[in-house]
Amino acid sequence: MAAPTKCQLRGRLVLLCSLLGMLWEARASQIRYSVPEETEKGYIVGNISKDLALEPRELAERRVRIVSRGRTQLFSLNPRSGTLVTAGRIDREELCAQSPRCLVNFKVLVEDRVKLYGIEIEVTDINDSAPKFQAESLEVKINEIAVPGARYPLPEAIDPDVGVNSLQSYQLSPNHHFSLNVQTGDNGAINPELVLERALDREEATAHHLVLTASDGGEPRRSSTVRIHVTVLDTNDNAPVFAQRIYRVKVLENVPPGTWLLTATASDLDEGINGKVAYKFWKINEKQSLLFQLNENTGEISTAKSLDYEECSFYEMEIQAEDGGGLKGWTKVLISVEDVNDNRPEVTITSLFSPVREDAPQGTVILLFNAHDRDSGKNGQVVCSIQENLSFKLENSEEDYYRLLTAQILDREKASEYNITVTATDRGTPPLSTEIHITLQVTDINDNPPAFSQASYSVYLPENNARGTSIFSVIAYDPDSNENSRVIYSLAEDTIQGSPLSTYVSINSDTGVLYALCSFDYEQFRDLQMQVMASDSGSPPLSSNVSLRLFVLDQNDNAPEILYPALPTDGSTGVELAPRSAEPGYLVTKVVAVDRDSGQNAWLSYRLFKTSEPGLFSVGLHTGEVRTARALLDRDALKQSLVVAVQDHGQPPLSATVTLTVAIADSIPDILADLGSLQIPADLEASDLTLYLVVAVAVVSCVFLTFVITLLALRLRHWHSSHLLRATSDGLAGVPTSHFVGVDGVRAFLQTYSQEFSLTADSRKSHLIFPQPNYADTLISQQSCEKNEPLCVSVDSKFPIEDTPLVPQAPPNTDWRFSQAQRPGTSGSQNGDDTGTWPNNQFDTEMLQAMILASASEAADGSSTLGGGAGTMGLSARYGPQFTLQHVPDYRQNVYIPGSNATLTNAAGKRDGKAPAGGNGNKKKSGKKEKK
């Protein structure tokens, strides 16, 4: 316990030292000076730089300045000498008046230290003012019968100085009848009195002249004098007498101040000053003395202020008349005040019952008030009224008391507040009135349900909206107030496509803002029907409903889908055939596409995006029909490649492209002959490449051997050279030249090509396939031919096939078939319309161009006819489809047909997931023949 006690004592000692230091610093920071008054400007008060422990030059460096409190600055700093000097003349009497000490306090700020120093300057008094009387002469009248010892007050002298410099004494000039008596008051003031020492005799001397001198105690001594004229009065033996003993007068209360009422006259038989009469009020109270005034010379009585009959209607007073000898006479004055209508009625509210419920019954008391008038007679009779067309009425319940009642049932929704003006009017002439204004609040009850601004709402929202998007804001207005008008919004429970409505949309219960909780898809559903309910917070709550229908607007969010031609399932590329004898406008094929959007977003247009032979083919703008633009020539290549672009009319437009391969030949043998001619240049090119590689390898080998021999001759031994050559020849012996020749680690890849075409036994048309080039040693391999085979040909069964491994061909996709109604017919005679409107039924007039892929089974058994059976893959006279569109979604209702209000309908049956009855039972394998 000893250690904590010592710590506490040490802490208290430190605190005490800190307090003493602060007191010492505060005392040290207070600087005191003194300066006499009336000094000239620039008078040095003190060396402030020394007292602040600063050099004179530091006053400017440290930005030392005087901080005043808005008063006129009496002192200033001299930055050169570091002294505090006067800024002008200082008058102590003007500054501090009669204060014993005159102190001037201000602060000096040292800005760099941010420290203030208190400065106290005492302004000392100098004897710069002499005692002064208010008048230079004074007349004193004394009756000759006055007895010795009588005292008469004399005027005082005023000296603004203080201390010894102030007034110290009075002196009276020498005489035989009077002496001077000086009295000192409680406040230290010196009051002189004139004392009669000897009786006066008017016959001996009618007047006496005296001089009173007032002196201060300063250096030099200052004084002033006043002359006193003493007049000896004669004896007075007649008193003043009034003409009437009682004066009566009547006056209206509204006469202005200064109105003459009467004149009371008194006479004195004496002569001279003894016969001169002076008038004054004698017996009068203080209130009356403020209302009336009396001329002391003439005796005229007039009003000094406005009279008030209601305050006092009768006044009684006495008037005294005194002559110069001191004799007096008296009379009585009676003043009657007559009433005029100068007071407005006064209305005093006794009870106010506000607010009032809007369902208050008729006759409910709202206000009880008193109305009275201070006037008398008819001037004091009051009549009260209120403005018309209000739901209230006035009743006079008792004398001067009125009640304000409800005249009918109130409706807060029509008027929530009433400003009632009660007018009180007297019956005077002219009548005076007073108005009071009352604000009556009507309390609401929950008698109104929320009401929507519309009977129903239709809202439009573009599809693909972001989640949480604000859709719409419904507003219901409740004419009630406060909680009765606070509306809470909600959605009625409902189910849409098996899911609760709350999974699609939500509503803010406070604001009525409808939000989307998911991204809507026009293709999924196009409108939502919901009920929005608005309930107030009253007791009991009231509610109302409104129907809201949300329409989902289609956006161009789906690109066109190419239905035909489609990529075969076996990975090959379909080929369309066109005879060399085709005339301009010959229908080669037709591109069929659909768009999942609707309206203009699904309106498709076709154009030829790219072609290997410009000007040879054209595409119908709205039909997608690929036709020959000119007659085919012998110089036209066998294989023509076309890229057709399909674009919708949405904003922004979306598009898709499809690549078509057209083989130009009149018959199937022509195709085979053309294929044979195409293989010869390929073999020549391969042989030329092999020759170049052999020559390059030989040259490089010679250079390498020469270099090795030279090195061996110079630096290596003969046996090491022989061993190195043997090892080198052994390493090169096992590399087949048909694959690659290595030159300094670089491999030259041999390119192999594969070609495949499919034929049917009953048709002159063929399916020609040109796969991608196959590279021997790359990571990417083609599935249509093996790596070591330079050419793969798939031929019909009536051609000889070598003993090579057979690769099974994928069967045609049985899901991609057209019904008989959808199967396109012969259309070579039709002409495409590039600028016209769409056909009336796009799916009924050659919508689809089927890929021509021969069926091996039909070619083998020869069961197919030229026209092709319903259950076979045979070809028509022109072309036939090899797949149906049963698995493709029916978007024809989305297709917009310009110039027509019709929509496309599906005539085909729905997909049943089963293969056709005949024609696809046998699968055919294509043989591959190696070309060297």
From Swiss-Prot:
Residues 29-692 are extracellular. CDD domains: Cadherin_repeat. Keywords: Calcium, Cell adhesion, Cell membrane, Glycoprotein, Membrane, Repeat, Signal, Transmembrane, Transmembrane helix. The chain crosses the membrane at residues 693-713. It is a single-pass type I membrane protein. Coiled coil: none annotated. One of its GO terms (cellular component) is plasma membrane. It is found in: Cell membrane. PROSITE patterns: CADHERIN_1, CADHERIN_2. Residues 1-28 form the signal peptide. Residues 803-841, 902-932 are annotated as: Disordered. Glycans are attached at residues 47, 127, 389, 419, 545. Residues 922-932 have a biased composition (Basic residues). One of its GO terms (biological process) is nervous system development. It holds the Pfam family Cadherin_C_2. Residues 816-841 have a biased composition (Polar residues). InterPro entries: Cadherin-like_dom, Cadherin-like_sf, Cadherin_C, Cadherin_CBD, Cadherin_CS, Cadherin_N, Protocadherin/Cadherin-CA. GO terms for molecular function: calcium ion binding. Residues 714-932 are cytoplasmic. It comes from the Eukaryota. PANTHER family: CADHERIN-87A, PROTOCADHERIN GAMMA-A9. Potential calcium-dependent cell-adhesion protein. May be involved in the establishment and maintenance of specific neuronal connections in the brain. This is Protocadherin gamma-A9. The lineage of its organism: Eukaryota, Metazoa, Chordata, Craniata, Vertebrata.
